[in-house]
Regions:
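Structured loops at beta-to-helix junctions and adjacent beta-edge loops in soluble globular domains
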Residues: 10, 105-107
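Generic anion/oxyanion-binding catalytic loop in active/binding sites
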Residues: 12, 70, 159
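ACP-dependent fatty acid/polyketide chain-elongation machinery
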Residues: 1-66, 88
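Acyl-thioester C-C bond-transforming condensing/cleaving domain
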Residues: 2, 18, 28-37, 86-99, ...
Length: 221
């Protein structure tokens, strides 16, 4: 039986705001998140600006120890998920864990962790690679960590569909509820890809704007 599907809660960690209200006001106000890259020295790169998330505090959403064992993309996912569950009135429960699932997509996953651990390997050898490297890196860990946080035991996986990843996740969640495989779904996407490898790679394939002189107006559809 096909069921009506509704959105009951929203959450957002974005380059123009770390919650839904701030993000929305920035969007309708035409505020750009573009600015020179601060996360690494991009002076020798073709592309030297990006839309970075600013002022994010993972400690608002995760235990500090848990956050240290999570790549930034997973931290962003947790922040948005906690907001969405609160917005839906489900932060304290009120849902059947067996009928609740999580689909969170990521195009690149924990690339920052990959970069860090590759440096460790080159400098100190394989025995110094963190045992947390793989679970921090894999793209489906964001969905896994969020599901553990809320005890969700329903469908749980990641989508990876390039720029359509988040929309793909939301569409899959819609169908999951519509066809009766779950009653509640947390869905969306997460990325933390302002990194040397990704900026260099996307830049060299000419997939990024090179209007470094005006980051705020570089996106021109």
């Amino acid at each position: 039986m096909r069921r009506r599907v509704v959105v009951t809660g929203l959450g957002a960690i974005t380059p123009v705001g770390n919650d839904v209200a701030t993000t929305w006001q920035a969007l309708v106000g035409g505020v750009s998140g573009g600015a020179p890259i601060t996360r690494f020295d991009a002076s020798e790169f073709k592309v030297r600006f990006a839309c970075e998330v600013k002022g994010f505090d993972a400690g608002l959403y995760m235990d500090r120890k848990e956050a240290r064992r999570a790549d930034l993309f997973t931290q962003y996912a947790m922040g948005a998920a906690v907001q969405a569950m609160a917005d839906a009135g489900l932060a304290e429960g009120g849902y059947d864990p067996n009928e609740t699932g999580v689909i969170i997509g990521s195009g690149i996953g924990g690339l920052g962790t990959m970069e860090d651990q590759h440096s460790v390997y080159l400098q100190s050898g394989n025995r110094r690679i963190s045992p947390f490297f793989i679970p921090m890196y894999i793209a489906d860990i964001a969905a896994g960590v969020v599901s553990m946080r809320f005890g969700a035991k329903g469908p749980n996986f990641a989508t990876m569909s390039a720029c359509a990843t988040s929309a793909h996740a939301i569409g899959e969640a819609f169908r999951t509820i519509r066809y009766g495989d779950a009653d509640v779904m947390l869905a969306g996407g997460t990325e933390a890809a302002v990194l040397p490898m990704s900026i260099g790679g996307f830049g060299n394939m000419t997939a990024l704007s090179e209007r470094n002189d005006s980051p705020a107006t570089a996106s021109r559809p």
